[in-house]
């Protein structure tokens, strides 16, 4: 907490007692941090802001804060607040609630007799990037996130937003959201909008035999991923997400599925495909084409989120040109990732033998792999990872290829997303180091102890 000095005017002459009919308070909030959890808004300490309001005490003991204003650098909140005898908010009205250059809204709130705070928000535009950043940090899906908010809060919230702004110049229009929390726990969520003003997106909290399941469906997966700052290199496709919100107190489990999409201009993918073993299998021209754009038919990514970490469990992606598997962890607290996987050139032909009983399992290996596969690892800093490729694995079929797997640092059967997939600010380009591509030199590296 940060101490804030209040300056008062309106003292009655000669008595030294407050004139409760019109006391004015002014404060400098520059060094204070302000939070509005319902909208993912935060004013950081150090950002200029001034507070002023007029205190009007009512005969019954309640208080109105009239002409309530918080103004400063890129910030303007104007309206009034009503308090009960215990100085708890009973209602507020902010006809103007704007911050930055992209958020322009009005907010009304009323505490009902049952203690539920009913909030209504409307506006032409809302900058949702801070909200999505908190969501992608994974702990916002877990019970541990409640410690940062009001655990006992009971909220009914509805919002209508003309244009919701996300990362990479992406946006959604005609956004409608209804949300209910009881005791700080999400119990109802319905949201819908149009990605880029065209393709529908829908989010819903469903009841599945007593468990809460969060579902999301988007008819433009690429725009949806860019909107929330998840992954910028995916184009097109349809996406579906299911998250079991009651899987555990700390972690949540889910599955992401995407169909009929392309990956375009991903620098980490280009690094993986730059290995000479890829040239030998794909041919130089197809290798260069794949670096620029790869078409996929299907992605399936089971995951576990919690404790500041995001784990992928035997995720796979496949298409006519290329397939891949991924296992490992992204640690948002340490800003590091550690993943391992196998990419499969000429996936459609390469995996055809998988249909042969017994022999197919031996030759192809895990789901999503093929007869010819090349193991790789992506490790290090989340913003600038290092790519390692093991060319010896191309000569080893199926289940025996696991001998050459890089150690992902997790128990067998867990894995991660990669490179630019998660966590970075998708609006910021960072200088990139050239990835170090090299074969394994010894058994120590083969075990992933590099």
Question: How should these model regions be labeled?
Answer:
Residues 35, 120, 125-126, 297, ...:
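Generic detection of intrinsically disordered/low-complexity segments and helix-coil linkers/edges
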Residues 105-124, 246, 253:
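Flexible beta-edge/linker motif
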Residues 127-135:
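Soluble, acidic/polar mature domains that operate outside membranes
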Residues 1-15, 19-86, 91-93, 134-344, ...:
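Solvent-exposed beta-strand/coil patches in large extracellular/periplasmic or lumenal scaffold regions
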Residues 344-387:
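Surface-exposed, gly/pro-biased binding rims or lids
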Residues 92-102:
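N-terminal accessory interaction module
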């Amino acid at each position: 907490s940060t101490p804030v000095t209040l300056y008062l005017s309106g003292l009655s002459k000669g008595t030294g007692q407050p004139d409760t009919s019109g006391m004015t308070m002014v404060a400098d909030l520059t060094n204070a941090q302000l939070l509005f959890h319902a909208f993912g808004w935060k004013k950081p300490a150090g950002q200029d802001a001034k507070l002023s309001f007029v205190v009007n005490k009512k005969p019954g003991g309640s208080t109105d804060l009239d002409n309530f204003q918080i103004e400063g650098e890129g910030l303007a909140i104007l309206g009034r607040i009503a308090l009960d005898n215990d100085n708890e908010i009973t209602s507020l009205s902010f006809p103007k609630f704007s911050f930055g250059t992209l958020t322009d809204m009005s907010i009304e709130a009323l505490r009902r007799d049952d203690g539920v705070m009913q909030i209504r928000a409307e506006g032409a535009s809302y900058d949702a990037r801070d909200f999505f950043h908190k969501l992608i940090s994974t702990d916002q899906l877990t019970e541990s996130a409640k410690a940062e908010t009001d655990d006992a809060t009971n909220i009914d919230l509805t919002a209508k937003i003309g244009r919701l702004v996300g990362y990479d110049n992406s946006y959604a229009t005609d956004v409608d959201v209804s949300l209910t929390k009881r005791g700080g726990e999400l119990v109802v969520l319905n949201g819908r909008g149009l990605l880029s003003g065209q393709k529908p997106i829908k989010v819903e909290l469903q009841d599945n035999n007593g468990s809460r399941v969060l579902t999301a469906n988007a008819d433009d997966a690429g725009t949806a991923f860019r909107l929330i700052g998840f992954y910028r290199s995916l184009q097109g496709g349809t996406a579906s997400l299911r998250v079991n919100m009651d899987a555990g107190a700390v972690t949540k489990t889910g599955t992401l599925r995407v169909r009929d999409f392309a990956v375009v201009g991903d620098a980490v993918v280009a690094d993986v495909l730059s290995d000479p073993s890829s040239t030998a299998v794909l041919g130089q021209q197809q290798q260069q084409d794949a670096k620029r754009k790869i078409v996929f038919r299907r992605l399936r990514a089971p995951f576990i989120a919690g404790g500041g970490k995001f784990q992928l469990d035997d995720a796979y992606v496949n298409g006519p040109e290329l397939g891949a598997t991924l296992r490992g962890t992204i640690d948002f607290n340490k800003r590091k990732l550690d993943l391992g996987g196998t990419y499969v050139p000429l996936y459609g032909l390469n995996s055809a033998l998988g249909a042969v009983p017994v022999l197919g399992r031996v030759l192809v290996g895990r789901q999503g792999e093929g007869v010819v596969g090349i193991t790789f690892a992506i490790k290090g800093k989340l913003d600038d990872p290092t790519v390692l490729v093991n060319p010896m694995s191309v000569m080893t079929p199926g289940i025996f290829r696991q001998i050459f797997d890089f150690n992902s640092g997790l128990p067998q059967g867990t894995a991660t997303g990669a490179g630019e997939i998660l966590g970075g600010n998708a609006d910021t380009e960072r200088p990139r180091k050239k990835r170090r591509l090299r074969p394994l030199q010894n058994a120590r590296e083969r075990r992933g102890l590099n």
